Design a protein with these regions (language model features):
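Cytosolic covalent-transfer regions centered on His/Cys nucleophiles
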Residues: 1-153
């Protein structure tokens, strides 16, 4: 199984998020991937649309302060993740009605549905760790957040 920490670098972790709503959030997380050089800027609109289309089906705010917007992109060689932390919470229309503090955007290759399921499975196992969302919410740097994830995997 792929460890989530192996798909994250400090360059794809944004603390604090600046977005004030879900639309701004998707734009911000896609920009994080572009700034890190893992997603070409020419694919910005496509990546945002993939997240928005998934969100229209059902909120990816899974509850407990966590949101997992995700989707599959054509012509992607490997999975891409971007982690954003909103210490004060962000309105997200989560399933429990509460704001989210931790958002992990996940893009997987359209040609590899197994990778998509595998990563979502690994993420769900990781976030079963009691108190992880609140501890991530308290992180002040991307280094601190990545180290916490590595310790808990």
């Amino acid at each position: 199984m792929t460890k989530i920490s192996s798909l994250l670098t400090t360059q794809v972790i944004k603390i604090p998020l600046e977005a004030e709503d879900k639309d701004e959030l998707f734009t911000e997380l896609v920009q994080v991937l572009i700034n890190a050089g893992t997603l070409p800027a020419a694919r910005r609109a496509e990546a945002e649309q993939v997240l928005e289309a998934r969100e229209e089906k059902m909120s990816t705010g899974v509850g407990g302060g966590l949101a997992l917007p995700h989707g599959r992109l054509a012509n992607l060689e490997a999975p891409l993740l971007a982690l954003g932390i909103a210490p004060n919470g962000l309105e997200y229309d989560a399933l429990d009605g509460l704001p989210v503090n931790v958002v992990l955007a996940i893009f997987t290759p359209e040609s590899d549905p197994e990778a998509h399921v595998q990563i979502l499975t690994e993420v769900s196992h990781l976030f079963l760790v009691p108190g992880l969302v609140s501890r991530l919410s308290a992180c002040h740097s991307s280094v601190e957040a990545l180290e916490l994830i590595k310790r808990e995997e």
